[in-house]
Amino acid sequence: MAAPDNANQSLVVTAFWEVTPGEEAAVAGLLKEFLPQAQREPGVKEFQIHQNLAEPRKYFFYEVFAGEAAFADHQQTAHFKNIIVGQAVPKLAKRERSQFRFI
C-alpha cells in the first residue's frame, strides 16, 4: 500500500502503556472517554487504541497527525491534559512513546 501524497509531512506517534495492577477498569473507562474526542481533533488523521489480548493491562496507541504542530495542539487539548495526563498516566506502571515519519 502506498503512503498518501501528503504522508511525508505527517507525524506518526506510537505509544505503549502498561497499567498498574488494580487500575485496569479505571484506565479502560478513561480511554473510552478520551478516544472519540481525540479522533475529532482537526489535525488528527488517525487515532487508534488497541488492548493486548494476552495481557489486557497493555495498550498500544497508533496516532497519525497532520504534522508536528497538530501533535503539539493535541497535547494542549483539555481532554488530553485532563483525561490522559491528569487521570490515566498516574495509573500506569510503564509508558513509552516514539515518533515516526512515513517514507
Put a short name on every predicted segment.
Residues 11-18, 48-75:
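Short, well-ordered beta-strand segments in beta-rich or mixed alpha/beta enzyme
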Residues 1-9, 49-55, 84-103:
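Glycine-rich beta-strand-turn "strand-cap" elements at beta-sheet edges
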Residues 22-23, 53, 80:
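Alpha-helical structural elements of signaling/regulatory helical domains
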Residues 8-10, 32, 62-65, 86-87:
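Generic alpha-helical hydrophobic packing signal
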